[in-house]
């Protein structure tokens, strides 16, 4: 049985981009978003796509995030939430995940086979 590994990234930002005309997020939209993320020198730590919204978690680097807002706000409704912490747990036990969920208000959660990522307010302990 693998031992749990916990990685905590402080000072994270959640950026949500919603199509202005409520059309679906498609490959063209994603290509544009990824291009601007690369131009800004940001790395996406967590992402999710819904029908009309693309959400991503990046390091909160104001000058770089401002670039995203300036370049993407014409095409998308831009929303940003800061003061967040990203907790990544590999090989978590069910009890460990329950404890994290009980101790934090979860803004965003993503689970794969062996990894769970939880986005929480940084002020929470």
Regions found by a protein language model. Name each.
Residues 1-125:
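A conserved regulatory-domain signal marking ACT and ACT-like small-molecule sensing domains
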């Amino acid at each position: 049985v693998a031992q749990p590994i916990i990685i905590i990234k402080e000072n994270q930002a959640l950026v949500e981009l919603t199509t202005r005309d409520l059309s679906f997020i498609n490959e063209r939209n994603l290509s544009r978003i990824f291009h601007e993320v690369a131009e800004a020198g940001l790395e996406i730590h967590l992402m999710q796509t819904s029908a009309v919204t693309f959400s991503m978690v990046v390091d909160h680097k104001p000058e770089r995030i401002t670039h995203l807002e300036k370049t993407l706000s014409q095409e998308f409704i831009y929303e940003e939430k800061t003061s967040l912490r990203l907790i990544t747990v590999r090989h978590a036990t069910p009890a460990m995940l329950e404890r994290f969920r009980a101790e934090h208000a979860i803004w965003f959660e993503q689970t794969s086979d062996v990894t769970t990522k939880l986005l929480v307010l940084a002020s929470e302990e």
